[in-house]
Amino acid sequence: MSNPFSLEGKVALVTGANTGLGQGIALALAEAGADIAAAGIQAPTETEEKVKALGRRFVAIEANLISIEPVQRILDETLAGLGRLDILVNNAGLIRRTDAVDFSEQDWDDVMNVNLKSAFFMSQAAGRHFITQGSGKIINIASMLSFQGGIRVPSYTASKSGIAGITRLLANEWGSKGVTANAIAPGYMATDNTAQLRADQDRNKSILDRIPAARWGVPADLGGAAVFLASSASDYVNGAIIPVDGGWLAR
């Protein structure tokens, strides 16, 4: 019997895969059998070494998704380097922390451009390819703030609420064409983006006190959800926003 979770012969494009959540997702997909294209502003040297150590092919694409200018080039370089594309993971993200009363237009635009605008246009470019080939998996990275308001991160909250919305929209439009669009909503993860929170003793304690798992998540915690949504095991899952949060939203 074939393994519905196998990604053998598949190619996944992961944005922002040089570190943190993107790296964890890329490695999980590679462990399941996928070859990996990684697009980002920094060279994903460590990710490349780890993926190749698993016996998978790897293509690194330098691109800054604060604008949509490199979107088509990212797709073209993926296809040129690996010959196909089956899975898109829109992981590249940015966060800026300031009280709403003081939040700047520049910070608003930067976060929205990376987190929402580029994610949509990456999905559009990949979606055209997926529709032509009759299959494809889009995995967006949402957030607990796709469900909640948060504090001091107005553009991040807006962008992640938007990610949930466009995930459902793409599922509605492309589901009949063999393309699924789903999202993973990570909880509090121990990454560079949360270093400031973890360094604040009181804030760190208040967060941990609410998480039933009683710990911060790590990038590898997203691996199972990513492999599921990338594989044929999830072919009838579409438009879902799946929390991976240690139980945070259950409280």
Task: Annotate each PLM feature.
Residues 11, 18-20:
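Conserved glycine-rich cofactor-binding loop
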Residues 32-46:
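Conserved glycine-rich Rossmann-like NAD(P)H-binding loop of the short-chain dehydrogenase/reductase
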Residues 71, 99-100, 104-112, 207:
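Substrate-binding pocket helix/loop in short-chain dehydrogenase/reductase
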Residues 82, 120-123, 135, 215-244, ...:
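C-terminal substrate-recognition "lid" of short-chain dehydrogenase/reductases
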Residues 123, 159, 167:
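Active-site helix of classical SDR
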Residues 143:
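Residue(s) in the substrate-gating loop at a strand-loop-helix junction
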Residues 175, 180, 237-239:
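Short, small/polar-rich loop/turn modules that mediate ligand/substrate recognition or access, typified
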